[in-house]
């Protein structure tokens, strides 16, 4: 089985041909003859839109021979990527497609397998390295351009993924979706995760210097602060979001200290995104003080064009299903075992 993809280009590559080197030029210097924008256009027409070389030539005002050279050059520069997939990975793709259909998502990206309980290393020890390639692929497919806004949530999974290489997306504005936490664990610090993600993709970090749950007296002042308003103002502009999904609060070994786990309302919660809890139907589950929470609303997630959730584990099955059906995200990065567990749910 063979898969082919045409990779998007950055805006810096999107420039017209110089007047001295028209599309039909026979110059042997492909770097001066064919811009990456032109190569991308030719490849997009031929591979994605299934136009013939003659049709591409007509659309670009050039010859078939030139189109053939363009397609070869597009492959050489990595604009067109062809992957030969062995039968095992083909089955992997079938699992991803079945999960995508079940959850009604746009895309599902499956990672390699995570360790079983019988193996020496725990899931958390290798989670980042296993999930990072699939997450990088999802981010690369988000179509982000310089100046676009990418939001990131807190959480152990996103934090672990942020330790590894991701696809460069230079010029993207990266911003947190929830205020800070006074707990020492790094995965509760969204500014730290924002910094890590920005460094990995070559983005521009925007930090939110506010607690996730300020007191009643501090909340009105904070939300009027210009520096905080600037970051909150990025939320409605988001083109994409990378988010973790929390397990049911009553089953978690650790949870933000501001969450009152003794609150009766949280008994209905199956999970959370950006510290916003929800039940099996995706309805918001409030708790005492949650009206002061400085965090992205669940309803706002539905308006973000590309919502990438990264989650693994049996305890994440229910929140993944509820979150997907509520359209809180439209893409999922997970492992094969979690995918099979979700498919087993009636």
Residue ranges and their predicted role:
Residues 145-149, 169-171, 238, 304, ...:
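A general structural motif
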Residues 173-181:
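Catalytic or ion-translocation cores adjacent to nucleophile or general acid/base/metal-coordination motifs
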Residues 157-168, 253-261:
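Short Gly/Thr/Asp-enriched flexible loops that form oxyanion-binding sites at enzyme active sites
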Residues 3, 30-33, 69-151, 163-170, ...:
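HTH-adjacent hinge/linker in prokaryotic transcriptional regulators
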Residues 42, 131, 135-139, 161, ...:
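Generic hydrophobic alpha-helical segments
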Residues 8-9, 16-18, 28-43, 48-56, ...:
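Conserved phosphate- and dinucleotide-binding cores of soluble alpha/beta proteins
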Residues 112, 151-157, 312:
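Glycine-rich beta-strand-to-loop/alpha-helix junction loops that act as flexible
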């Amino acid at each position: 089985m063979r898969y082919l993809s045409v990779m998007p280009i950055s805006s810096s590559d999107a420039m017209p041909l110089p007047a001295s080197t028209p599309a039909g030029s026979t110059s042997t210097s492909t770097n001066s003859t064919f811009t990456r924008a032109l190569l991308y256009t030719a490849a997009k027409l031929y591979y994605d839109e299934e136009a013939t070389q003659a049709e591409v030539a007509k659309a670009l005002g050039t010859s078939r021979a030139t189109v053939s050279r363009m397609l070869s050059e597009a492959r050489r520069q990595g604009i067109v990527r062809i992957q030969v997939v062995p039968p095992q990975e083909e089955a992997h793709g079938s699992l991803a497609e079945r999960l995508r259909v079940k959850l009604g998502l746009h895309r599902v990206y499956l990672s390699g397998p995570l360790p079983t309980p019988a193996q020496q290393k725990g899931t958390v020890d290798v989670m980042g390295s296993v999930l990072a390639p699939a997450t990088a692929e999802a981010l690369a497919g988000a179509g982000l351009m310089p100046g676009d806004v990418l939001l990131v949530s807190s959480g152990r999974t996103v934090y672990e993924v942020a330790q590894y290489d991701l696809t460069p997306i230079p010029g993207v504005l990266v911003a947190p979706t929830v205020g800070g936490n006074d707990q020492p664990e790094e995965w509760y610090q969204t500014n730290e995760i924002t910094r890590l993600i920005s460094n990995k993709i070559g983005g521009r970090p925007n930090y939110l210097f506010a607690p996730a749950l300020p007191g009643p007296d501090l909340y009105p002042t904070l939300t009027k602060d210009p520096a905080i308003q600037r970051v909150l103002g990025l939320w409605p502009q988001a083109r994409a979001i990378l988010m973790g999904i929390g397990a049911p609060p009553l089953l978690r070994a650790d949870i933000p200290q501001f969450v009152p786990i003794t609150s009766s309302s949280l008994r209905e919660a199956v999970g959370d995104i950006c510290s916003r809890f929800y039940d099996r139907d995706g309805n918001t589950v409030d708790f005492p003080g949650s009206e002061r929470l400085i965090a992205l609303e669940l309803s706002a997630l539905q308006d973000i064009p590309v919502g990438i959730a990264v989650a693994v584990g049996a305890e994440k099955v229910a929140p993944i299903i509820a979150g997907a059906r509520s359209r809180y995200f439209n893409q999922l990065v997970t492992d094969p075992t979690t995918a099979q567990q979700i498919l087993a749910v009636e």
